[in-house]
Amino acid sequence: VQPRIGEVIESTTTAFTAGAYELLAAPPFGALVRAQARAEGMVVYGLVYEIRTGSKEPGGRALVRGRTYAGRELYDAEIYHEHPDLAEVLQTEFSAITVGFVEDGRIRQYLPPQPPPVHYSVYETTGEELMRFSEVTDFFRTLLFASQIPSDELLAAIIRSAARARAGTAGGERAYLVQAGREVASLLKDDYDRLTAILRRIRP
């Protein structure tokens, strides 16, 4: 059974935020994640567009820990090693834009009838699951026209990941990049500058 990586702490129709169970262990930017839904057999897919770590206290901020009162200097990972209590006072969270769901065993790349409930489990997807989801590219449009997220960077990241997942398969990595590039070109045919910027980001 695949271990869950966190749980939903905020949920809307178009996005959800999860708290990671391990400090600094969020899935990477652009990762496809899966949240459990209330309906039997339904899961909701999201793409991670923001990762943040901060104080668990509302309105609180992390304190400087790199220098002790005795003048000892601590750097980077040493700080976490010297202060294991940081895992109790800090929390890593990640937000994902909803790009589809599974219902009755079928992947649907539009918004689910209900968002995943707060406190429900969130999982990373496998390479096989990512390949299956990205076979259809309807979600490209969702990303390109989403507001308040780094949509172009996010689209490029998921295209690169989906292509890498196909390395060693019959179609292969390059074939997917070509297919994805054509789809992006058709969606952005009237915005050459934006199109070329995305194509540069997915170039192998």
How does the language model describe each region?
Residues 1-17:
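Short, basic/aromatic beta-hairpin or loop at an interaction surface
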Residues 4-9, 31-32, 41-53:
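Short beta-strand-centered aromatic/proline hotspots
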Residues 15-20, 54-67, 96:
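Short, solvent-exposed secondary-structure boundary/capping segments
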Residues 26-28:
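Short, well-ordered loop/turn sites that connect or cap secondary structure elements
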Residues 82-204:
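Charge/polar-rich, low-complexity and marginally structured segments
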